[in-house]
């Protein structure tokens, strides 16, 4: 059975050049930094005298922090631990635990995105804010979308098989 027959998807990511993998990691970093910048910019905008009647509070930070925690969890899991088929140091219970932790990470990412929409609707749209105040609420949504793009790009590039990749362990 070849690698293409045993994979879930029919496209081969291993045919991409090593520089494509580096570009994917850089792209994920750019998306992550942009997400942080968009939200922190909105928080600083609301902290000063520019937004007199509306400020970004801890409620606005909760979806942001959930997404960051989700990215850390998702990208901290060793991808080889997800399949119970490997023979090195894994068993079915370890694969099950890794899948559960991966699910928690993706649930935190999705919860952060859903929470940002909820905060935007309840705090900004229902209250009737408009203009730049509405942009402060949409900054949370934009940053969480950028977090999702970053996590997806890093997950895909982390799963690329590289013919010249050696894993040396003692």
Swiss-Prot record:
Q: Which residues cross the membrane?
A: 23-43, 54-74, 101-121, 136-156
Instruction: Report membrane topology.
Output: Multi-pass membrane protein
Q: Which GO terms describe its biological process?
A: late endosome to vacuole transport via multivesicular body sorting pathway
On the tree of life, the source organism's domain of life is Eukaryota
The answer, when asked if Flavoprotein is one of the entry's keywords, is: no
Q: Where in or outside the cell?
A: Membrane
Q: Give the UniProt entry's GO cellular component terms.
A: fungal-type vacuole membrane; Golgi apparatus; Vps55/Vps68 complex
UniProt entry keywords in alphabetical sequence: Membrane, Transmembrane, Transmembrane helix
| InterPro entries noted in UniProt | UPF0220
- UniProt similarity note: Belongs to the UPF0220 family.
* PANTHER family the record matches: SMALL MEMBRANE PROTEIN-RELATED
Q: What is this protein called?
A: UPF0220 protein C8D2.02c
